Regions:
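Catalytic-domain carbohydrate-binding cleft regions of carbohydrate-active enzymes
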Residues: 1, 5-342
Length: 342
């Protein structure tokens, strides 16, 4: 298995320098969910110019960032000038000509100096970006599809790690790892290798991302018992974080249970999804019934095109200026912390 393909993963990198006449075979397996519609699969073979793609994103990222700045901000005015000068250097009369590539090189050199060297490196605010995939073990699909989806998603991560040496990834739910171990032991070994490198983080505390409203106290304890034991035995790591991005509510006894199970930190999202009685804190100490305290953080990441005033935040953040800048704008505890989680 090479990787998964879906609406967010539309490309498969085949080879860096293919030779004329080389043949590549690719087998596809598809699943349409509960929809009974007819879908048409269209495949194109593309040649990617890495320098051209880099120049595109180096221009696009600050351009999208402008939309979140006030019109009279000095940084915005300077950025508009730098972007205008960069675009004016491009010769678009004959794309892919010698003159075109020379102009792209000149534009890239200019934006690197004018934007990324002179305006970049602002360290008073930090966005810690964590690669992550959220998979529901039980939702609108069969358990067999969960098994397959786990393998596809983890294969995609391993493929991205080959292409991007600086890419780091975190994933919870030992149950998903057990699916991969059963179906693709060779992939599971590659995951273990990445864990040893420090690029793959098996973390999350529980066996699955469990409901915490209806679940009994004993069941919650066993979630931690089975989850922490699996990650310790399989990867040699001791979980300290309860990672529940997609759960809607929590028992008041949970801080006590977490403390007793060796959990020090808690991350969630949906407690901040109230439209009217908005939760006043994003980073705080959650005190349980017995007085146990757990450091808790609510994700503040915004979706692409989403306003700061929206009550909705997402644990499926895109690496986009709207998510990063919007996440800081949305964060309510700037006086105690300058590092947000994306």
């Amino acid at each position: 298995m090479i990787q998964g393909l879906d609406i967010n993963h539309r490309e498969v990198f085949v080879k860096a320098n293919a030779k004329a006449g080389e043949t590549f075979r690719m087998d596809l397996q598809s699943y349409t969910g509960t929809l009974h519609d007819e879908f048409h699969l269209i495949v194109d073979l593309e040649e990617h110019d890495r320098k051209l793609r880099k120049a595109y994103y180096d221009i696009a990222v600050p351009m999208y960032g402008l939309n979140r700045m006030k019109e009279d901000d000095k940084i915005r005015l300077d950025l508009e000038t730098a972007l205008t000068d960069t675009i004016n250097l491009l010769d678009l009369r004959m794309p892919y000509s010698k003159e075109f590539y020379a102009s792209v090189e000149a534009a890239e050199a200019h934006i690197q100096e004018a934007v990324y060297e002179k305006m970049g490196g602002y360290e008073e605010v930090i966005a810690t970006c964590i690669g992550h995939t959220h998979i529901d073990v039980a939702w609108l699909w069969t358990v067999d599809q969960v098994r397959q989806k786990s393998c596809r998603s983890f294969a995609t991560v391993l493929k991205l790690m080959e292409e991007y040496p600086d890419y780091h990834f975190m994933s919870s739910q030992p149950k998903l790892y057990s699916f991969v171990k059963e179906r693709h032991p060779e992939m599971y070994q590659r995951i273990k290798d990445r864990v040893k490198e420090g690029r793959w983080e098996p973390e999350g505390g529980m066996w699955v991302e469990a409901d915490c409203n209806l679940t009994s106290g004993e069941s919650l304890v066993r979630q931690f018992q089975f989850g922490k034991r699996f990650f310790k035995e399989e990867f040699g790591v001791e979980n300290k974080i309860l990672w529940l991005p997609d759960v809607f509510g929590y028992s008041a006894a949970l801080p006590q249970i977490m403390k007793k199970c060796g959990i020090e930190y808690f991350m969630t999202t949906k407690l901040a999804w109230n439209e009217f009685d908005k939760h006043p804190y994003d980073s705080f100490l959650w005190e349980g019934i017995d007085g146990s305290r757990i450091f808790t953080h609510l994700i503040t990441t915004l979706g692409v095109g989403q306003s700061e005033s929206s009550f909705f935040t997402t644990y499926n953040g895109m690496l986009h200026p709207d998510a990063i800048m919007g996440g800081w704008e949305r964060y309510q505890n700037k006086e105690i912390n300058n590092d947000i989680l994306i």
